[in-house]
Each structure stands twice: as structure tokens, then as C-alpha cells.
Regions:
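Short, flexible loop/turn elements at secondary-structure junctions
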Residues: 31-33, 83-88, 99, 118-123, ...
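Gly/Thr-rich phosphate-binding beta-strand-loop-beta motif of the actin/hexokinase/Hsp70
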Residues: 108-133, 138
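Non-catalytic, compositionally simple segments
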Residues: 8, 12-114, 123, 142-179, ...
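A short acidic (Asp/Glu
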Residues: 8, 124-129, 209-218, 235-238
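Short, exposed "boundary/linker" segments that immediately precede the start
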Residues: 1-7
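Short, surface-exposed connector motifs at secondary-structure boundaries
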Residues: 192-200, 219-223
């Protein structure tokens, strides 16, 4: 609204002595706290002195109720409707949102899928996923990769049991101290040859993926470029959030993917667009969450074609 222009432009310029206008009196109406917005509607007048004429109380009440369960709505509302400055990132999912202990109790063999990867740099965690939709449930098959020589260091840094996850079959260790993306290719090929799961499209971020993409294309996979930007990932991330909250994503209770989802923040812009971001520590891996969001982005592009194939 106009309050943002008044607040951020003339006030800043006036304080920096860029302009000299004695007729300019910047004035910002705001709340004393965020909590009072949710506990006392009578306080809304503080940041909305024209409430009832320019802006209706019913509008604020509707958006306030929606914001309780929607991070991007909350950030946008606090900034635009109550003039409270927001940070760029916030927690994306609660544990109850992301936790789903359901297992794959139906056969996923001989299915059409959406594939996706988040390829790390040479020494970090890498993730590949297959997404299969059946009867409104999205079944996710994730698999993770890490260089063998850095595993002990990563166990100490990340404080998670990579060695146990490897023993349980959730994690493949590559020889040496660098990732071998040909093992990611091998995993996709095994799903095709052993399980009859055919990824119709495989999404990837073009950064660091040139040679791997060529290898996959030579084997007949259709590769889909998905750049990791806020406008590309916002809608699929919101859709994944809604599906997780409604328990429509069955990831076979994979502990690494669950940990990655718990580590993921939502970086938010002023328009309520979101994209995945790490929690404050650089050791909080989010690769599985990013790969799954990329899979959702590919599904959005080809939803009609995919749903026709899986009927």
C-alpha cells in the first residue's frame, strides 16, 4: 500500500539529507506487537486508522484466520495490513505437518512417475526422488548419495546417523571424497529395469548438472530444467506444503527426507512468494525437500499429460 512508499522512500531520503522538504511529515501506523493482532481485534485500529471505510474488519479477520496456517499469507498480512517489518525467512513446516509414518503398502511396480534430483556440490548430500500418484496420494521414493570418505565428518557436523542410514539402505556411499553422479543414473536405471517404474520426465537444476544430464539423455530419459528461483519454486512448494499437511504425501517414512523437510525454511518475498532455504546452520541439509519440490514443479508442467497416463 501507500504506507510502504511513504515509509521506505521519502523517510529514508529525508534522513539521508538527499531531499529537504519541510512539508514532508512521514507517519507510520503500526501495532505494538504481533500477538495482539491474534488476541484482540480492537487493536487493529492502531495500524488501520481508517478501518471500516478503506479496509473492512471482515477482510482483516478472514486473512488473519488464514495466516494461522499459511506462512506466506502471515508474512504478507503482517507487512501490508499491519505495517510490521518481516524477516526474509521463516519456519516452513511444523513436525506435525511433515510427519507421516505411513509406509508403501501397495505395489508401485510398473508405474509411471515424475523424477527429480538435487545434485549437490562434490562433497555434500545428493538426493533423487520418484513421485508416483495413485488415487490422490503421491507416493515418493527418495534415495540419497554421499561420498564415503566424508561420511564420518558429516556425522559429526550434521549430528545425524549417516552410517545407520547407509546400513538401512536409505543412503548410497560413493567411493572417494567426491560424489559420483553416475550412481544416481544407476539408481534411476534400476528402478526402470527392476521395478518397471518409468519416469516420464526428470527435473533438475542446471547448475552443476551438464554432464549428468547428457548421460541421462543418452539412456533415453526426458530431462526437464527447473531453475531454483522463487518464481519457479513458489507454487510447487506451496502445493507440497498443502499436501503434506493433508497427509497426501507418502514418503515411506524415510528418515533422511523427514529430516530434510524439518530443516527447510521458507524464504519469502513481499508478494508472498516462497522458496526453500536452509535453517541458520549450514549443516542443516535440505536436499530431499528441494528434490521433491522440483518434482512438484515438473508435475505442474505436465499435470494433464501425467494424469492421462496414470488413469
Amino acid at each position: 500500500g501507500n504506507h510502504r512508499n511513504l515509509h521506505s522512500f521519502p523517510t529514508r531520503r529525508s534522513s539521508d539529507l538527499e531531499i529537504n522538504d519541510e512539508k514532508l511529515l512521514p507517519w507510520l501506523y503500526t501495532q505494538d506487537s504481533q500477538d495482539e493482532i491474534y488476541t484482540d481485534k480492537k487493536t487493529w485500529q492502531k495500524s488501520n486508522p481508517s478501518l471500516g471505510s478503506i479496509k473492512l474488519e471482515s477482510y482483516l479477520e478472514d486473512i488473519m484466520n488464514k495466516s494461522k496456517n499459511d506462512l506466506s499469507t502471515r508474512v504478507t498480512m503482517l507487512c501490508k495490513d499491519f505495517n510490521i517489518k518481516q524477516t526474509e525467512s521463516g519456519s516452513w513446516l511444523t513436525y506435525s505437518d511433515l510427519n507421516n509414518e505411513s509406509k508403501h503398502t501397495i505395489s508401485l511396480k510398473n508405474s509411471y512417475a515424475i523424477g527429480a534430483v538435487d545434485l549437490s556440490n562434490t562433497t555434500d548430500l545428493t538426493c533423487a526422488v520418484l513421485l508416483i500418484q495413485k488415487d490422490n496420494i503421491k507416493y515418493v521414493l527418495p534415495h540419497f548419495f554421499m561420498p564415503k570418505d566424508v561420511m564420518l565428518k558429516r556425522i559429526e557436523e550434521d549430528s545425524v546417523p549417516y552410517d545407520l542410514w547407509h546400513q538401512q539402505g536409505f543412503l548410497t556411499l560413493t567411493d572417494g571424497n567426491q560424489n559420483d553422479f553416475s550412481l544416481v543414473t544407476k539408481w534411476f536405471m534400476e528402478r526402470v529395469q527392476k521395478d518397471g517404474i518409468r519416469p516420464l520426465w526428470v527435473g533438475y537444476d542446471p547448475w552443476n548438472a551438464l554432464y549428468w544430464v547428457k548421460e541421462m539423455e543418452e539412456l533415453g530419459f526426458t530431462m526437464e530444467k527447473v531453475r531454483q528461483g522463487i518464481y519457479t519454486l513458489s507454487e510447487p512448494m506451496k502445493q507440497l506444503e498443502a499436501d503434506l499437511k493433508n497427509k497426501l504425501v507418502n514418503y515411506n517414512n524415510n528418515p533422511i527426507l523427514k529430516w530434510n523437510l524439518a530443516n527447510t525454511q521458507a524464504k519469502i518475498d513481499i508478494n508472498g512468494n516462497i522458496q526453500p532455504s536452509k535453517l541458520s546452520s549450514k549443516f542443516r541439509r535440505i536436499d530431499g525437500a528441494v528434490a521433491l519440490i522440483i518434482a512438484y514443479a515438473v508435475l505442474n508442467r505436465y499435470r494433464n499429460e501425467y494424469e492421462q497416463m496414470v488413469k
